[in-house]
Amino acid sequence: MAKAGPGGPDRILGSLHAIPHEGRLTAADDLFRRMPAADVMRRYFAELLRLVEGSDLFQILAHLDFPRRMWPRAAGPYEEQAFETEYRAVLTALAAGDRILEVNTKSPLVSAGLLGWWREAGGRAVSFGSDAHQPWRVGDKFKLAVDVVEAAGFRPGRDRFDFWRR
């Protein structure tokens, strides 16, 4: 795995924002207009699994279910359980590489149940990210994200910069 260190970045995140479709990388919100929402999520998870298994350049996986942020209302409520197999495949591969799962505070969609899957897969730690894009938004909904992480059995690390561990 790539190492962060002196003079370089503290942490290296891996994330996926677009999905291959018809020979091009396509944003999930565009794909939601072209195909059933569940198909978009399954394609996303398949590509995310390829990223996790095929690259050791990152330490933390961000945006575990990024397209969920754009889930169309017409598709009904988003249910993590409908994609449990896909979540578990990604989480198992991530844990096998001794990596960290990010919990995003911008829109903390992750549940204690999903973090339970992370634990069951062998995941040992989580990181918080705000995905703020504006300085004044850093840490929005942090308390909510902490509550979810604690409910899943993760606790603060040695200092405020450390990962939360089980």
Go through each PLM region and give its residues:
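Extended substrate/RNA-proximal surfaces in nucleic-acid metabolism proteins
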Residues: M1-A95
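Charged catalytic cores and adjacent phosphate/nucleic-acid-binding surfaces used
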Residues: A74-R166
